[in-house]
Amino acid sequence: MKLPTLGKCVVRTLMGAVALGAISVNAQTLSSNSTGTNNGFYYTFWKDSGDASMTLLSGGRYQSSWGNSTNNWVGGKGWNPGNNSRVISYSGSYGVDSSQNSYLALYGWTRSPLIEYYVIESYGSYNPASCSGGTDYGSFQSDGATYNVRRCQRVNQPSIDGTQTFYQYFSVRNPKKGFGNISGTITFANHVNFWASKGLNLGNHNYQVLATEGYQSRGSSDITVSEGTSGGGTSSVGGASSSVNSSTGGGSSGGITVRARGANGSEHINLRVGGAVVANWTLGTSFQNYLYSGNASGDIQVQFDNDASGRDVVVDYIIVNGETRQAEDMEHNSAVYANGRCGGGSYSENMHCNGEIGFGYTYDCFSGNCSGGNGGSNSSAGNSSSGNTGGGGSNCSGYVGITFDDGPNSNTATLVNLLRQNNLTPVTWFNQGNNVASNAHLMSQQLSVGEVHNHSYTHPHMTSWTYQQVYDELNRTNQAIQNAGAPKPTLFRPPYGELNSTIQQAAQALGLRVVTWDVDSQDWNGASAAAIANAANQLQNGQVILMHDGSYTNTNSAIAQIATNLRAKGLCPGRIDPNTGRAVAPSSSGGSSSVALSSSSRSSSSAGGNTGGNCQCNWWGTFYPLCQTQTSGWGWENSRSCISTSTCNSQGTGGGGVVCN
């Protein structure tokens, strides 16, 4: 793979560059690493070897050239600091071809969080959207093109703050600009807004430049950059072209309209918001608008649940916040039959199998033109009067993922008690299968304060493993967790955060969403309790922190301060949505009476399964059938997981309980 670290080396110019003396107003050619200002613009130039050079010209213009003797180089002109709202215009020539490994991009850094970002306008032989181990976040339209968004993680790599672990955000233009004479406009706010809608937040800006970059290649550029005017309006989900039918019965703030039809007229769908079924309908054979008029908040899914011979569902779109979201623009579709299996495709309006299409969050605004609220503060779904103690309080302005790896073990009971005492629930446990097998009796304690998911069986390095080896390791862990009485995991955190396409494919085949972290507490590296609490204090809405359940006693000592700091910021613990990997609100807080379900959804047999009569268990925002024969813990009845009444009602603050119609 080429170019996975391009841009990293720019950082070294900030740490050890040879500073220029007084900058001349005349053209000046740089052949040594340097940063500074020139004719009112910030510039950066770095190379690790070879003949690459950059010439500073008037205003925002620079020229560059490099040959195959240069391993890696990058340079450009722009601003320091950058900002979220700048509109960047550029023009000139980009002298590479499709065989050369190079980018032309808006490039920059932020702190708190530490983020390296790219808006790729053109590239050669390597498409950065294929970076190994990354996560795709869909696409949007800006400045006359579609941009595909991907996030990658860099582990212990150079940054503007030394060697760090951080995320890269990529927006990659499609179609790319090409080569030769080139010009364009980047309305950066559109990228910032779309990233933020997916939980990809920027921090405080450092530099921001229109950069040329090359890796083991040859080429040249002559680029002039300036601040311009927007050429492409607000961002929107790519491809959303259908208009809203004038007969729609909804779409205003606080309601959701689903436009759908069935193949034979007996298909049944549920509307799920924040993990709960809020409405359900039996479809006709022609498109109709189905209206939910409540105000539930959270992630939105349309679920098909009675697949049989001759039954298929077509979902045209939904309307929320006055915005139309086309089904074919949504990445998550576990019901489409493609590539020889159910759930084998994306971006389709068809539902051939039982499953769901994910439509984002109620507070998202993909088009930038919404009539309802789309701020993070609207993500709270609770009707509880319990304040902000626990994961669903009415004072929550956002939700974060509190996660612990490597359990269960001798520390688990102590940690569970601390979490309860400080109302820091729900949490997400990423368990090792071998520890589960040895300590199955601790599973119920973990489940009493959150959810349990997959962290491999033996915590190995797996990047050199075959697909089958990875699959077996993860599947063995799933079985251990289920044998101990927990539901089948839907999330997987790779050991050491190491990820490649093989690991990703094996996880997907097992129905596991790969989840890493936004903030590393460094508890595994000997961080003090104060340092761990300070790390947690960096969390923003939707983000996830890495901590550990084990011999790291400083983690236990930090729990009280973490809880205090989060409450002061209006942030509450949440669950991690398996569709997005983001922390979201539990759909309930403070007991079963706070669960907001419509009467039609409560009576639906599909909502709670065939066990437990007309009752079901709200387990930290996810609904499971009640066991009929098992009296305690989790069970397996009628070919699916179930939960006993006593265990369901044992959840702590922020949990749910038994819900009956």
From Swiss-Prot:
Pathway: Glycan degradation; xylan degradation. Residues 220-259, 578-610 are annotated as: Disordered. Residues 394-577 are annotated as: Polysaccharide deacetylase. It comes from the Bacteria. The active site is at residues 116, 213. It is found in: Secreted. CDD domains: CE4_SlAXE_like. Residues 1-27 form the signal peptide. GO terms for cellular component: extracellular region. One of its GO terms (molecular function) is hydrolase activity, acting on carbon-nitrogen (but not peptide) bonds. Endo-acting xylanase which specifically cleaves internal linkages on the xylan backbone, releasing xylooligosaccharides. Is able to hydrolyze oat spelt xylan and the arabinoxylans from wheat and rye, releasing xylobiose as the major product. Also likely catalyzes, via its C-terminal domain, the removal of acetyl groups from acetylated xylan. Thus, has the capability of hydrolyzing acetylated xylan. Does not attack mannan, galactan, arabinan or any cellulosic substrates. This is Bifunctional xylanase/xylan deacetylase. It comes from Cellvibrio japonicus.
